[in-house]
Amino acid sequence: MAKPTRGGQKKKVRRNVPSGVAHIQSTFNNTIVTIADTVGDVISWASAGSSGFKGAKKGTPFAAQQAAESAGRRAIDSGMRQCEVMVSGPGAGRETAIRALQAVGLEITLIRDVTPIPHNGCRPPKRRRV
């Protein structure tokens, strides 16, 4: 009889990565924190939704803080000590996510705002009438 195969699971490779890049994408509805090594391979990620927040609470600074702490702890477990931070988006959790990465123990060497700004590109959505 044939051996049962492992169902499509990759073996997790534990690498020792001393430095990397933390990308914080902060929108009005959610905050996503992705930590990668210098090559660009993702080491850990977390979002406000994956941290247990639902609905409008995902857009809060506290949810961004929890997501950044979760991703930062996993990055530290893989040996990361310092990182550069790339922040994009207009959301409420930008600064709190950076502070949470510092509080978790990552040394931040650079903070760069990489929010895409159009040179008069697409027409923006109409204004809300509430």
From Swiss-Prot:
Coiled-coil ranges from the UniProt annotation: none
InterPro entries found in the cross-reference section: Ribosomal_uS11, Ribosomal_uS11_bac-type, Ribosomal_uS11_CS, Ribosomal_uS11_sf
Gene3D superfamilies: Ribosomal protein S11
Cellular component terms (Gene Ontology): cytosolic small ribosomal subunit
Entry keywords, A to Z: Ribonucleoprotein, Ribosomal protein, RNA-binding, rRNA-binding
Pfam families associated with the record: Ribosomal_S11
A single GO BP: translation
UniProt GO MF annotations: rRNA binding; structural constituent of ribosome
UniProt-listed NCBIfam families: PRK05309.1, uS11_bact
Assembly and interaction partners: Part of the 30S ribosomal subunit. Interacts with proteins S7 and S18. Binds to IF-3.
Annotated function: Located on the platform of the 30S subunit, it bridges several disparate RNA helices of the 16S rRNA. Forms part of the Shine-Dalgarno cleft in the 70S ribosome.
Family, per entry: Belongs to the universal ribosomal protein uS11 family.
Name this protein carries in UniProt: Small ribosomal subunit protein uS11
Organism: Gloeobacter violaceus (strain ATCC 29082 / PCC 7421)
